[in-house]
Regions:
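Metal-ion/cofactor- or nucleotide/acyl-coenzyme-handling active-site neighborhoods
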Residues: 1-135
């Protein structure tokens, strides 16, 4: 959102990149964004993506993997609240919504929870907003 000030934006989807390309913020992108021209840092997609195909491109998880790789011991995160299986209002910007079935959303929630649990064994994750992934 434009009303939130930040130093960097982490992007691994071209659709989201197009929303931030002209914003005055530093961009960290992943190597799968072959058409991207305006960025500050590019990371190897395969190095930080999840093994599970259903959540392979989850930007929140990719960012957490990157931060862990950088040696960050504690992360505070907002907005990683989990998918609403009714598939309504999962994103602040409705233009970023995906068309998933309730079963797909439930599977994603379970896989993300498992991945976050594994990450929490290596780093402290503090959820600033309500999240189904908070343990």
């Amino acid at each position: 959102p434009t009303e939130v000030s930040c130093d960097y934006v982490f992007v691994c989807h071209m659709r989201r990149y197009k929303n931030v390309v002209n914003q005055p913020v530093k961009k960290i992108i992943t190597s799968n964004l072959r058409e991207a021209k305006e960025y500050d840092h590019m990371l190897n997609f395969a190095s930080y993506s999840c093994q599970e195909p259903a959540i392979m491109e989850n930007s929140g998880l990719m960012c957490l993997h990157f931060l862990m790789h950088m040696g960050i011991a504690k992360v505070s995160i907002a907005g990683l609240d989990g998918y609403d299986i009714t598939n309504r209002g999962n994103y602040v910007n409705s233009g970023l919504e995906y068309d998933f079935t309730a079963e797909q959303l439930q599977e994603r929630n379970e896989l993300i929870a498992k991945e976050i649990s594994a990450l929490q064994e290596k780093m402290e994750i503090d959820f600033l907003t309500d999240s189904i992934y908070k343990r």
